[in-house]
Amino acid sequence: MASNNSIHQFSIPGLTGGMVDFGAFQGKKILVANTASECGLTPQYKQLQELQEEYKDSLVVVGIPCNDFGGQEPGTADTIAAFCGRNYGVTFPLTEKLSTKAPNQAPIFQFLTSKELNGLQDDEIKWNFHKFLLDEEGHLIASFPSTANPIEAMLQYMPA
């Protein structure tokens, strides 16, 4: 049973069906990013996919599309999935499109940005591709701004 300050309590519909059950990722680190297909930072999909491939036994990358910043994720689920697969070879889980901001902020983003809920820190998502790192028990251990290179940001947290 996941504790209240663990991301393992969340299960979100997948972009193209099924569920992304964070509880199924127990024992692995989880890197969550709010993503967008029409953003200047969209090429980070490539780096996120490289992390997923390099550390597949100890890390799960999860992309959560959002249209909160500049309307840069206007597509349908099928359009987003096709774009990510065709352009970046994305194989990591993508959830349905969610909101990162109030008043419609999704519960998972409430958890990731509230110290009261995650036990570590309050945080504000200011743009697409903000990244959150959670440990093997689902506890938040780090947050990286949108401009942080995912691979460089993760170096200190992953085995050499």
Please provide the spans of the model-predicted regions.
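N-terminal "domain-start" segment that seeds a small globular fold
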Residues: 1-23, 43, 106-107
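Conserved helix-turn-beta segment immediately C-terminal to the redox Cys motif
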Residues: 28-29, 38, 42-67, 84-88
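Thiol-based oxidoreductase modules, predominantly thioredoxin-like and allied folds used
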Residues: 34, 58-76, 91-102
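Short, internal strand/loop/helix patches
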Residues: 78-126
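Thiol-/selenol-based redox modules, centered on thioredoxin-like
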Residues: 110, 114-160
